[in-house]
């Protein structure tokens, strides 16, 4: 049984608070574990959430501000200490190479060879390493070079068992129909794959952190089943958001609406806001976005919504 869920480790922005740790987000995707933006204290939050170093197969860093990267030394040294043997690929902006080097070798420790650095440069980068899904990085609009990430699995064709049975198509004929897109039946009639199958779009996860409003944020989030996006400020602080190239809750909702997102997770909240203002984040995002909205809390788990489907009928082997 596959498991696809987001485990939120930290939800504050530049300064952690008593209730909110620095950033940290762990995406469990079947046998893969992708750690996004490990801020200060990520190791400790992993312990609370039941995540081990062995669970991490990839790390994605959006940019090298401290709240998104100060946890890297501890995570890397924990990977080394715990004897992780599988490759752990780390994607990050190539423009921050000097900061990567400092964090990678921040203190003395018995090093590991499993860390594979993947510096990113360019307007659109397909990050290599996984066969089951594609990792795409696009630049965002922040004060230093920053990338957002999109995890997408390919669409799949599933055969409709009830329609196949009604037409008398079975056995090897089903395989030929799926492979070739059509077949000629015993009566000489052409049978089209589209009439006996349904396209199941692959699931999509998007991670948009530290940016002003920009086209690439929408592109990253396009038709995402789950979007994790910063909402540093409430709408009243729109001027501050623009000055520091961050998003308001309303802008996060607008991006989600434009992209056709299914489930929206708001996070990366300024320390100026307390518990009594949390409902305002949801309300301001909901003014633009009609889908499901989750206000992230530390050590929260959020499921990736089940796959979308197009067409109808019983799916064979689903």
Swiss-Prot record:
Gene3D superfamilies hit by this protein: Ribonuclease Z/Hydroxyacylglutathione hydrolase-like (3.60.15.10)
Active site, renumbered: 67 (proton acceptor)
Cofactor note: Binds 2 Zn(2+) ions.
Cofactor(s) needed by this chain: Zn(2+)
Reaction(s) this enzyme catalyzes, per UniProt: Endonucleolytic cleavage of RNA, removing extra 3' nucleotides from tRNA precursor, generating 3' termini of tRNAs. A 3'-hydroxy group is left at the tRNA terminus and a 5'-phosphoryl group is left at the trailer molecule
Enzyme Commission number, as recorded: 3.1.26.11
InterPro entries documented for this protein: Metallo-B-lactamas, RibonucZ/Hydroxyglut_hydro, RNase_Z/BN
Binding site for Zn(2+) 1: 63, 65, 142, 210
GO molecular-function term, one example from the UniProt record: 3'-tRNA processing endoribonuclease activity
Pfam families documented for this protein: Lactamase_B, Lactamase_B_2
Keywords for this protein: Endonuclease, Hydrolase, Metal-binding, Nuclease, tRNA processing, Zinc
Binding-site positions, Zn(2+) 2: 67-68, 210, 268
UniProt-listed CDD domains: RNaseZ_ZiPD-like_MBL-fold
Record's keyword annotation contains Isomerase: no
Family, per entry: Belongs to the RNase Z family.
Subunit field text: Homodimer.
NCBIfam families named in the record: PRK00055.2-3
The protein's role, per its UniProt record: Zinc phosphodiesterase, which displays some tRNA 3'-processing endonuclease activity. Probably involved in tRNA maturation, by removing a 3'-trailer from precursor tRNA.
HAMAP family assigned to the protein according to its UniProt record, in alphabetical order: RNase_Z_BN
Name assigned to this protein: Ribonuclease Z
Lineage: Bacteria, Bacillati, Actinomycetota, Actinomycetes, Streptosporangiales
């Amino acid at each position: 049984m596959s498991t696809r869920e987001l485990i939120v480790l930290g939800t504050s922005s530049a300064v952690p608070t008593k209730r909110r740790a620095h950033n940290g987000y762990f995406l469990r995707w079947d046998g893969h574990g992708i750690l996004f933006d490990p801020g200060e204290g990520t190791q400790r939050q992993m312990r609370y959430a039941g995540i081990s170093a062995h669970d991490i197969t990839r790390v994605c860093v959006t940019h090298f501000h401290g709240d998104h990267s100060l946890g890297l030394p501890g995570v890397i040294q924990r990977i080394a200490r715990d004897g992780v043997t599988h490759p752990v690929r780390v994607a990050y902006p190539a423009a921050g190479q000097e900061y990567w080097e400092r964090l990678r070798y921040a203190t003395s420790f018995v090093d590991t060879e499993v860390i594979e650095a993947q510096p990113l440069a360019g307007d659109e980068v397909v990050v290599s390493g996984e066969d089951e899904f594609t990792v795409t990085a696009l630049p965002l609009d922040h004060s230093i070079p920053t990338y957002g990430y999109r995890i997408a699995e390919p669409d799949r064709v599933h055969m409709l068992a009830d329609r196949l049975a009604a037409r008398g198509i079975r056995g090897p004929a089903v395989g030929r129909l799926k492979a070739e897109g059509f077949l000629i039946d015993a009566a000489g009639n052409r049978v089209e794959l589209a009439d006996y199958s349904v396209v199941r779009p692959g699931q999509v996860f998007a991670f948009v952190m530290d940016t002003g409003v920009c086209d690439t944020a929408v592109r990253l989030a396009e038709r995402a089943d789950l979007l994790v996006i910063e909402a540093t400020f409430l709408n009243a602080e729109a001027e501050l958001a623009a000055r520091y190239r961050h998003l308001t809750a309303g802008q996060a909702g607008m991006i989600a609406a434009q992209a056709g997102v299914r489930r929206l997770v708001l996070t990366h909240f300024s320390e100026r806001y307390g518990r009594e203002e949390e409902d305002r984040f949801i309300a301001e995002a909901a003014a633009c976005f009609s889908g499901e909205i989750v206000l992230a809390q530390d050590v929260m788990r959020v499921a990736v919504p089940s796959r979308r489907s197009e067409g109808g009928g019983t799916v064979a082997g689903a």
